[in-house]
Amino acid sequence: MKRIIFEIVFIATTWYIFLPPFNLTSWEFIFFLCGHLVVMGILFSFRKDTNLLKTVHVRHGKVANELNLEGLHFNKLGGGLLLVSGIIFALAGLVSLVTSSFFQAKNYANVVSITEKDFKDFPKSDTSKVPILDRSTAEKIGDRYLGSLTDKVSQYVAADTYTQLTVDGKPYRVTPLEYADPIKWFNNQSKGIGEYIKVDMVTGNAELVDLKTPMKYSDSEYFNRDVKRHLRIKYPTKIFKTPSFEVDDEGNPFYVATVYQKRFGLGVPRPSSVIILDATNGETKEYSLDEVPEWVDRVYPAEETIEQINYNGKYKDGFWNALISKKNVTQTTEGYNYLSIGNDIYLYTGVTSANADESNLGFILENMRTGEITKYNLASATEESARASAEGAVQEKAYKATFPILVNLNDKPLYIMGLKDNAGLVKEYALVDAVEYQNVIVAATVDELLSKYANKNDLELDNETVENIKGVVADLKSAVIKGDTVYFFKVDGKIYKVKASVSDDLPYLENGQSFEGQVGKDNYLKTFKVK
């Protein structure tokens, strides 16, 4: 009886700690089940009158306890439990083998559906919404911002979540605060966590968002208010991984857990539904994939999507072709990023041949809420080649480029990226031609970068924040502002400004000359050309 009670307590404790789903298609549960069958088999293989531990003498009169193997004998019950464990594990291994890519190559290739288009169909880029900063930079900005708030940093730290979302059409990374240590949790858990950090991925501005109702459920909670444990208790049979922290359009905090079902036995997991947990009160609701609220951004995780896109590129012509001849075998490039398009967030990565050469065959965009995947065919340089080209343009500064993002400016494919110093902060920006990647433009701001590109290529960039202007220069003057030479002049009595970096013509500009360009709301000319 004692052994039965011990095993029941042991099962409950290990389940509460490791939280495997009660689902036979989950390897977590299979290991959990087989492990406990082995433990029970060993326990019931000891004679009832045998102490499981025995005292042994060590040197110098010291004693220690060790397992009493002398009392171990495999009776029918103990041996049967061990046999059942072995059978279950063997069957799971057999099913796993049968559902592997060796036998199911076509099924692996068809796990995702990819629509192919030409680059002319690639969404036009709104440069005011391109997330130039990368995750590590956002983390540094957010952590430093919290460190400046002395009343918060003594009790809380920033979680390492930093989920990228699209909020009101703009890209942000958000992360909740978490208790600095168990003592801080004990002192503050009754009132909860009242703030989260929000970092603008375009400007780099950080803010601490105050919540009307504090979060009582988070990853830094203990016991039943831990997010994953709370969900597991309410949904014991569902397969899900670590839920993502998200906020809705009103800034309310939630945790979003994608529920998976295995394709063909123990094969590839695919999303089947979504569970949303209100972080303020613990209320949950499960949605089918076609009912997911529009504010939810991350239903299809990036790493799994990329893996399954690679299945498609690898196995579309069969297992042996992928292994030997590799004809038409493709794979995603190393690294990925995110784009905000409309109110959704899209996964972006390149596609190259299996030979992993220096050129891309195209680009992938995946709507992370709906799972729709589109491949845009375009022969171009890989992201790593573009990064190397950008870093080479400023090699004297030893800057490191962030992972590039493909943008469509006037139907031209370009990589845009930040250039970071040794401290991990973005100091300059680079624009690299995706086809002729030796063509690089570098500037201190994104606006200057785009202005340089427009002037160099005699283009008018599509941007709602600028308007065309032309006229005759009058009252020309110049001044140095924050290290930049700025030219001032009047047109019809109105003062306009333009930085020297915008055009090589500016040092030679004279009163009475005609010009044309584009001006922003701040009266700075974004492009400038002498007529």
Language-model features and meaning:
Residues 6-531:
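Soluble extracytoplasmic regions of secretory-pathway and membrane proteins
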